[in-house]
């Protein structure tokens, strides 16, 4: 797949736009997907259902995330994005805490080309069994970048 494969191929630019931002404020169990709430959402290609962001086919999307959490000292949290239910370790973020601090943060970005069928994106939180409780907050931003070549404008 090349960069030029994502251009629309129409005589004029595609006039579709869609972007959203979702907030997270929770204390979920380890190995669970983070619940999100809509902060804002424009367009029809991106929508949220509790823990999953759905992306309509035919577009390239940019996903940005930032999270701040309070696991216990000498511990960690790990945020792993899931695309269509599959953990994406390439985009995973491991955030350790030190002996004097309980704060951990994670951030990253990645693109998702959605060609034929809609795709779902979620964020899985993992932390050690010794951590009794973790408070996490953050935001996920989703931006439709452009139409993928070969799909109708």
Q: Predicted regions span which residues?
A:
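Extracellular jelly-roll beta-sandwich "head" domains, especially the C-terminal globular C1q domain
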Residues: 2-153
